[in-house]
Each structure stands twice: as structure tokens, then as C-alpha cells.
Amino acid sequence: MMAKSVYKTVIFGAGQIGQMTARLLSSPCQLLCFADNDPHKHGSYIGNIPVCSPDAAAALLPDLVILGVLDEERRNSMIKQMENLGYHGPFRDPSVLRMFDARVAVMRLL
């Protein structure tokens, strides 16, 4: 079986980690949206990428969901939430961003 040429991707979490992940994302990922549990963010845009509810994101039938948080407990909760919404594809976490965690902490202080 051949690998997909483009992966329809959702980043779950529209905060700083999710946004940083989006900036580092490259092909073969097509970023469909940010999913977020904060209803005040729904309908807004980060750059040209829409922010929607997790159920709206699951309805887009993504091939991949990147979890835009570093906290393991929150990631596990997000995985369960997406699975309950019918998404059963792969999840990735932004573990590569752990090296930037100190920068994120400094950014929060600014």
C-alpha cells in the first residue's frame, strides 16, 4: 500500500503550543483547522486557519490529529474526546516542542 501524498490534519488545541506546531508543520500535511474546547474561539481564525469545535473538526474526517498540548493528562482527555466523536485515526503529540518549553514559559510571562 502506498503512503498518502497529503494528510488532512487537525491540530487539537488553539493555544501557544498548537500555534507553534502549526508554524512548524510542513507537507505532506494539509492543516484543515484548529479544534478547541473553548466556544469563544469557535468561528475565529489563526492566520487563515479556522478554529472550530472538536465535533466539527471530527466531521471533516481528518487523516491525522496533532495534540497541541504538552500535558499528558490533557492529551489523554483529548484522545478520548476525539474517539468518542468517531475519529479513530492516528494521534501525534508535539513532543519535539518540549525543547521549546522554556521559551513558551518565558512567552507566557511577557
Task: Name the predicted role of every residue range.
Residues L24-Q30, M82-N84:
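Short, solvent-exposed amphipathic alpha-helical segments in soluble enzyme
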Residues L32-N37:
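Short internal beta-strands
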Residues P39-L110:
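Phosphate-bearing ligand-interacting subdomains
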Residues S5-L25:
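Glycine-rich adenosine-cofactor-binding loop
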Residues Q30-L31, G43:
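Secondary-structure boundary/capping residues
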